[in-house]
């Protein structure tokens, strides 16, 4: 019986750790806006998915000291996120089912985007290119749609 408990616990630990991951990124060193040399982007891109049939596509390119975090819980959630902005963050949280988000932040230095969708069949489209800016979208319930553009 003890062996069965240990095996069950090990299966939970292994399956739980397979659900989370950090995605490696590449960005050039060299000079960047006269700021001197950099050995890398010094940024993080993390995707955490819990449940089933969730999908995430993320690109973080030439985004120094930036952070992108996608967390999806439930079933059938989708995310398409792109960032190419220095000192900026994107945080996407989707809980429920069939929520979809498309988020793009390019050339928007020192900017933040936060999107939270809770429920089902919600959709968000966010585009930001304005520096020193922030966008926040929060949707709770079912069948909500939001579009936010900040240039």
Swiss-Prot record:
Residues 1-20 form the signal peptide. GO terms for biological process: cell adhesion. It comes from the Bacteria. InterPro entries: Curlin_rpt. GO terms for cellular component: pilus. Keywords: Fimbrium, Signal. Disulfide bonds: none annotated. Its main location: other. Induction: Constitutively expressed in agar-grown cells (at protein level), part of the csgBAC (agfBAC) operon. It is found in: Fimbrium. Belongs to the CsgA/CsgB family. NCBIfam families: PRK10051.1. Curlin is the structural subunit of the curli. Curli are coiled surface structures that assemble preferentially at growth temperatures below 37 degrees Celsius. Curli can bind to fibronectin. This is Major curlin subunit. It comes from Salmonella enteritidis.
């Amino acid at each position: 019986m003890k062996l069965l408990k240990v095996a069950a616990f090990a299966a939970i630990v292994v399956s739980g750790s397979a659900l989370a991951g950090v995605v490696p990124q590449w960005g050039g060193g060299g000079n960047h806006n006269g700021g001197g040399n950099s050995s890398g982007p010094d940024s993080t891109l993390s995707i955490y998915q819990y449940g089933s049939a969730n999908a995430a596509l993320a690109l973080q390119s030439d985004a120094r000291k930036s952070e992108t975090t996608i967390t999806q819980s439930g079933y059938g959630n989708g995310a398409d996120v792109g960032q190419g902005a220095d000192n900026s963050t994107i945080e996407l949280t989707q809980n429920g089912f069939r929520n979809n988000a498309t988020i793009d932040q390019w050339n928007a230095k020192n900017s933040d985007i936060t999107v939270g969708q809770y429920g089902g069949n919600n959709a968000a489209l966010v585009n930001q290119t304005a520096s020193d800016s922030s966008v926040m979208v929060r949707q709770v319930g079912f069948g909500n749609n939001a579009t936010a553009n900040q240039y």
